[in-house]
Amino acid sequence: QDAKKFNKVVLDYALPAALFVSIAQANRKMLAEDLKLSIISLVVLMLCFMIVYFVFRYCFKKNTQADAAVSALISGSPTIGFLGFAVLEPIFGTNAYVALVVAIVGIVVNAVGIPVGLALLNAGNAKAAGKKESPWKPVIHALEQPVAWAPILAVIWVVVGIPFPKWLAPSFDLIKGANASLAVFSAGITLSAVVIKINWQAILGSILKLVMMPAMILVAGLIFKMEPENLKMLVVAAALPPAFSGIIIADEYDTYVATGTTSLTLSVILFMGFCPLWLWITDACCKAFL
């Protein structure tokens, strides 16, 4: 019950506000500056998201559509909002390109991934309840939730070219700072309430997140000749542990909580080894093929 109270605060207030201000403070020039980076991020990350969804939907007979949707929100999404700067800046330094990668991956994960995941989740719950609804109803229901429409509104804000009011920044930055703490704390409460049991689904989720996603980004970046430094940052961003927001959504909907939290815990531990490994692999590939 305590976790659910925190989840509601995070999903309805803190996270939407944080997502909005993070994206709205970007600009069209930033998105267009490296169009190749933007397109590869969108296509590959969402392809990985849907691969995770279909793998968990059809390879495990006991899984429902809602289970698969939550698994995609967890193992198909890097936790860029919480760990993006914390991981990338110590490795690559504080510069505009780090901010660019974090902003673009954040837009893909939050403005595309979360609404798609919630739509699949709502459709699965409606199907399980035996309701025959319009295929658009789950999408509309997902978009009614602040955590889905706030990042989409922010993207529209950026594309239209409206400058973010400087006088609003301090208030939103305060909420953004509180969101990171609340979200991690809420995810921690959820983790503490669940007995961690390693199973094949948790292991597969970690493999898909830590191996498949960065590997596909690396291959796409090499094929389309991305700038080496940007490619390294994008690969590390893709290798980040699963999104904490996925765990919060799982707990809020009472769906796939145990396996999802186990996969998150396993991925966080394994990331300590996979991060330097992917840096070495990407560096070697860039020297060989770019």
Where are these regions (language model features)?
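Alpha-helical transmembrane segments of multi-pass small-molecule/ion transporters
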Residues: 1-290
